[in-house]
């Protein structure tokens, strides 16, 4: 055994949870991701999906992908920089830019590669990156790849953000990067106050709208639109893997920023471009969420009903303001156990443990879709109450 194998062989935490029968990852789904999914030959209520608009199984989205494959083939065989740009990519970029209210947009192969490529491309050694300490892992990795000076502020603590800004050279670029909706806790960034501090300290703002697009704002344009601050946010990032029912991501900004990123963001230049099917499916989903406002209304009807039911049942759900509902457990082992008990009762939820949260903040994450019914929500709440009570958590 080599030194690397010796080092990595010591990592046996997954095996310990497997031995206890509570390992919760890589569970296999045997069909489309709707509100109910086929797993192990059984129907399971799906409350662990990020498909907020409920479009992943929509026949129009599927058919758009099929047609694109017939026209363009299964892949692009190159990066956008060289032979991998399709007219379909350009159309999607134009429509995304218009949708989020920016001059231009660039499409990347995944949402993760947007943040891991854009962030280091924007700053150098003389600049500063300032992040919320609960920003997504892709933002964390993006700032780690940057040569800039890096600062963090306590979650949604605007006084601490101001303290960090005061540490910066006033003549240097100061890039504040924040999740619009925090993916584990479901709360929103305090964007109005961040914008105020932007002007006070001559900073730049980048908002990750991964969990805001299709959920907040007019026609689902995101948290920036929800606050009426699109024009104050310099860069807007989004993904296709949630409300747009596909895979990929984008960054939108003014033309000068996009021109720079187009020629300097390494994950854009050196990654193969989005497949034709993924691009066409995202484009069709974008059309649907604009054409069907009732879908957004249904999402919020389901969300508000679920929030009411979980609160009435006595769950601790924190400060969530979104279809992401955290049910706090505050114990890693019990978080895995409650996930297993819920699954045994036919409810799929996601466990959240460090490093996705602080050790004292472990939780199970419930997520709503526009297509969830009140009956499905009621059944899920009933089963989760049973699971939590079995572990003396309620």
From Swiss-Prot:
Q: Which InterPro entries match?
A: Aminotrans_II_pyridoxalP_BS, Aminotransferase_I/II_large, AON_synthase_class-II, PyrdxlP-dep_Trfase, PyrdxlP-dep_Trfase_major, PyrdxlP-dep_Trfase_small
Q: Which organism is it from?
A: Bacteroides ovatus (strain ATCC 8483 / DSM 1896 / JCM 5824 / BCRC 10623 / CCUG 4943 / NCTC 11153)
Annotated Gene Ontology cellular component terms: membrane
Q: Which reaction does it catalyse?
A: L-serine + hexadecanoyl-CoA + H(+) = 3-oxosphinganine + CO2 + CoA
Name of the protein in its database record: Serine palmitoyltransferase
Tell me what gene encodes this. Answer: spt
Q: Does the keyword Lipid metabolism apply?
A: yes
> Anything else the record notes?
The bacterial ceramide synthesis pathway operates in a different order from that in eukaryotes. Furthermore, phylogenetic analyses support the hypothesis that the bacterial and eukaryotic ceramide pathways evolved independently.
Q: What is its EC number?
A: 2.3.1.50
Superkingdom assignment = Bacteria
């Amino acid at each position: 055994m080599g030194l690397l194998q010796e080092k990595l062989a010591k990592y046996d935490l997954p095996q310990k949870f497997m031995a206890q029968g509570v390992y919760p990852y890589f569970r296999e789904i045997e069909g489309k991701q709707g509100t109910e999914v086929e797993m192990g030959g059984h129907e399971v209520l799906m409350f662990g999906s990020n498909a907020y608009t409920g479009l992943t199984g929509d026949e129009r989205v599927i058919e758009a992908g099929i047609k694109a494959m017939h026209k363009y083939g299964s892949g692009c065989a190159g990066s956008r920089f060289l032979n991998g740009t399709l007219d379909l990519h350009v159309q999607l970029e134009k429509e995304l830019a218009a949708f989020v209210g920016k001059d231009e947009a660039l499409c990347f192969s995944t949402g993760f590669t947007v943040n891991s490529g854009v962030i280091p491309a924007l700053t150098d050694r003389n600049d500063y990156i300032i992040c919320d300490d609960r920003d997504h892992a892709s933002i964390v990795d993006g700032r780690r790849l940057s040569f800039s000076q890096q600062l963090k502020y306590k979650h949604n603590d605007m006084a601490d953000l101001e303290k960090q800004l005061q540490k910066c050279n006033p003549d240097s670029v100061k890039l504040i990067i924040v999740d619009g909706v925090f993916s584990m806790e479901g709360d929103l960034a305090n964007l109005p106050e961040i914008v105020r501090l932007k002007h006070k300290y001559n900073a730049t703002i980048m908002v990750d709208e991964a969990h805001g697009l299709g959920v907040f704002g007019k026609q689902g344009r995101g948290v920036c639109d929800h606050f009426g601050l699109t024009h104050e946010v310099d860069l807007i990032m989004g993904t296709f893997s949630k409300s747009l029912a596909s895979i990929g991501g984008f960054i939108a900004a003014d033309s000068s920023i996009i021109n720079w990123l187009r020629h300097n963001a390494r994950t854009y230049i050196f990654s193969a471009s989005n497949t034709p099917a993924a691009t066409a499916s995202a484009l069709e989903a974008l059309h649907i969420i604009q054409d069907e406002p009732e879908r957004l209304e249904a999402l919020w009807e389901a969300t508000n009903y679920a929030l009411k039911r979980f609160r009435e049942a006595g769950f601790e759900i924190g400060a969530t303001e979104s279809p992401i509902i955290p049910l706090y457990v505050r114990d890693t082992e019990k978080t895995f156990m409650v996930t297993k008990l819920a699954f045994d009762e036919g409810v799929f939820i996601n466990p959240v443990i460090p490093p996705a949260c602080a050790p004292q903040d472990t939780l199970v994450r419930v997520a709503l879709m526009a297509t969830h019914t009140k009956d499905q929500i009621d059944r899920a709440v009933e089963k989760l109450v049973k699971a939590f009570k079995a572990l003396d958590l309620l």
